Amino acid sequence: MDSPENTVPASVDIYAVLSILLVAIMWGATNPFIKRGSIGYNELKADSKLGQLWLEVRFLITRWQYLLPLVINQLGSIVYVLTLQRTELSLTVPMANSLTFVFTAITARLLGERQSGWKIYCGMTLVILGTVICGLDKML
């Protein structure tokens, strides 16, 4: 049996990296679109709780602006589960979740949402740096 010093480090394959990036993009880039697609949801008012539930469900399922990004987001979850089967859990989870934030911020900015300036960019830089360190730790 090999000792830990004699084991060959597992390299991260391109499939793993691309899958994690795809998941982060599918989750992160759809968040601002889901938010936009649900505009008007909070103004719905009904006389009963059941009536309120019906109004909310009907509102959401009849808006393609909400449903399309939601479906893409959920397909990202399927890609995530498939990625977990092939990659290391301690690499996939933090990288996908942290990069989701980055892609959410980028997409929101591209859609014209106002952001708090340097704090967002500082946070994105730290997230990317942490993701790189996490990936390098798994490769070395």
Curated annotation (Swiss-Prot):
Which segments cross the bilayer?
A: 14-34, 64-84, 88-108, 116-136
Q: How does it sit in the membrane?
A: Multi-pass membrane protein
Gene Ontology cellular component annotations, sorted alphabetically: membrane
Superkingdom assignment: Eukaryota
Where in the cell does this protein reside? Membrane
Q: Which InterPro entries match?
A: TMEM234
Keyword list (alphabetical) reads: Membrane, Transmembrane, Transmembrane helix
Q: What Pfam families would the database entry show?
A: TMEM234
Q: Which residues form a coiled coil?
A: none
Q: Which family does it belong to?
A: Belongs to the TMEM234 family.
**UniProt protein name:** Transmembrane protein 234 homolog
Query: What is the native source organism of this protein?
Result: Anopheles gambiae (African malaria mosquito)
List the top taxonomic levels of the source: Eukaryota, Metazoa, Ecdysozoa, Arthropoda, Hexapoda
